[in-house]
Amino acid sequence: MNFKKLPKIELHCHLDGSLRVDTILDIAKKDNIPLPSYNKKELINYVSIMDDCNSLDEYLNKFFIPNKVMQTKENLKRIAFELLEDVAADNVKYIEVRFAPLLHVEKGLNIEEIIESVLEGIKEAEKLYDIKGNLILGCMRNMDIPSAFEVVKKGSKFIGKGVVAIDLCAGEEPHFPGKYIEVLKLAKECGYRITIHAGEAGVGENVLEAITLLNAERIGHGIYIKNCAEAYKLVKEKNIPLEVCPTSNLHTKAFESYETHPFMDFLKDGIKVTINTDNMTVSNTTITKELEMLNKFCGLSIEDYKILYLNAVEASFASPETKEILKSYANEITA
């Protein structure tokens, strides 16, 4: 089955986890940014999972170097443009790029400049390629609560101009949603859609609380609902889409193999799952690679993929007009 030729949708892709290694090298040389190595083969080991990774926290260490080259307007615009260029080459028709603006203030940029630069890169790529993109703003759970309010408030002026949603990301502690009730209440009032990283690192109850306390419309990962019957039931009853990222889940040791990943069980039980990369560079993956692995190890069929694709259309935060265009591509999904 040629998954490369099929239309695709990406709902969970981190900008700072999806840079070209060549671009990291190029910017580092241009801006005099120190790197542990300027040899591409050696540098890959610092920004990608090559052999083994023991935890989510270890996985997150791979973002340190990419963020060093994402501190100017020019670089942010370029990196956003290149991401859309890369996924368009993989026949992705729509992508929701997510990033945390406060990771890019080291050289004095303000939040508005940071968001604007990324949006410019997205819009430039849209003009050249058959792809549409939107932006999800991330609030870092390892920063203080006032910083989350700052992102919500300052990012709100871009709602309707390319920004569609708010997210909570970084390491996952049990019962984190309770700390962010007021932040997400404000986000909802501002008009953001809401997707929350939860149930990625062993705590299924976080998914339950993300939905009940934070009004999450989608869940990033959510795989540990398998260990929390109440969360599983709520996700199924409310038809909450899960942004599943299989290779990333293997890298963070959520599961030992594709065969033991609960994705197919969720799909067969009617859970609204979507397939995503999480971080193309860190996990050395693409949507096509994800689908090929699921086909090889889990028996993913063309019929299954059509369900996944239409799930992603429905789950997306795209405009009604864009959703209609995306639905029309489903006719191309044939073996």
Swiss-Prot record:
Q: What is this protein called?
A: Adenosine deaminase
Q: Which GO terms describe its molecular function?
A: 2'-deoxyadenosine deaminase activity; adenosine deaminase activity; zinc ion binding
Q: Which HAMAP family match?
A: A_deaminase
Q: Which organism is it from?
A: Clostridium botulinum (strain Kyoto / Type A2)
Q: Which is a Pfam family this sequence falls into?
A: A_deaminase
Q: Which residues bind substrate?
A: H14, D16
One GO process term, biological-process aspect:
adenosine catabolic process
Q: Which gene encodes it?
A: add
Q: Where is this site: Important for catalytic activity?
A: H221
